[in-house]
Amino acid sequence: MIFSTLEHILTHISFSIVSIVITIHLITLLVDEIIKLYDSSEKGMIAIFLCITGLLVTRWIYSRHFPLSDLYESLIFLSWSLSVIHIVPYFKKKKKNLSTITASSVIFTQGFATSGLLTEIHQSAILVPALQSEWLIMHVSMMILSYAALLCGSLLSVALLVITFRKNRNIFCKRNPLLNELFSFGEIQYMNERNNVLRTTFFSAKNYYRSQLIQQLDYWSYRVISLGFIFLTIGILSGAVWANEAWGSYWNWDPKETWAFITWIVFAIYLHTRTNIKLRGANSAIVASIGFLIIWICYFGVNLLGIGLHSYGSFTLTSN
């Protein structure tokens, strides 16, 4: 009873902190100069991480099994994994300009998990026979860690595409017929030369910053996705061994397994494109962006179906 109450308290605290951090992030998007707000949001992310950790430990003790048996528990663990990816660069004092992407992932996932939409599966239950195995921690944790890393890496690639393909607004008009009537040829030539100098200086600084940001996004998306791909491979292989012990077959092509294989193929293609210098950058980022959608279909969309050998981790949306 005590652990159940503590879990309930931590759930509401984490949701409250998420709401506060969302507000702070919205303010920092409007006012970039307020450094104290940025520090407050980062401290809020650390508080969220501590709450999620306490929530997982409490549920583990209360349910007497590792909290990865259903969608709600896996969402909490996914939030924890995303928060780890977020706070590690923060403590190393690196890549603050990339923290907004990882922070948004944590806020969205934890906010959804604790918002009350999954109230029906919040209560802990006895594990079904298929999950009463030592492979539960190995397989499911590796899969969730891979989802977290691949989602963050894919979001970095999406940001890379947005910055790359965003068109520059031409703040200086190239031709103006009215100038030809009001000014002489020499005056027009002088004004054009001055505008060209200003425009060149402005866009040179802007393009330099943009190129540096694109390089950072490309660099970190590749490394985070590579880490996630390793986790995904380990998760699929451990799941195959577990499936052979439980069902007598390494692979059964149920919806979850099929989409996990599709996810693996997509990110294998991404890593393959990275070996070609000509395909790096925007081309490989497009593949990673496709992978972002595939991950959500594999992790969340398949659970809505409630069919297949992994149906015990699903849920159904019911109306009152």
Curated annotation (Swiss-Prot):
Coiled coil: none annotated. One of its GO terms (cellular component) is chloroplast thylakoid membrane. It is found in: Plastid, Chloroplast thylakoid membrane. It comes from the Eukaryota. The chain crosses the membrane at residues 15-35, 43-63, 71-91, 98-118, 143-163, 224-244, 251-271, 285-305. GO terms for molecular function: heme binding. The keyword Membrane applies. One of its GO terms (biological process) is cytochrome complex assembly. The keyword Cell wall biogenesis/degradation does not apply. InterPro entries: Cyt_c_assembly (IPR002541), Cyt_c_biogenesis_CcsA (IPR017562), Cyt_c_biogenesis_CcsA/CcmC (IPR045062). It is a multi-pass membrane protein. Keywords: Chloroplast, Cytochrome c-type biogenesis, Membrane, Plastid, Thylakoid, Transmembrane, Transmembrane helix. May interact with Ccs1. Belongs to the CcmF/CycK/Ccl1/NrfE/CcsA family. NCBIfam families: cytochr_II_ccsB. PANTHER family: CYTOCHROME B_B6 PROTEIN-RELATED (PTHR30071:SF1), HEME EXPORTER PROTEIN C (PTHR30071). Required during biogenesis of c-type cytochromes (cytochrome c6 and cytochrome f) at the step of heme attachment. HAMAP family: CytC_CcsA. This is Cytochrome c biogenesis protein CcsA. It comes from Panax ginseng. The lineage of its organism: Eukaryota, Viridiplantae, Streptophyta, Embryophyta, Tracheophyta.
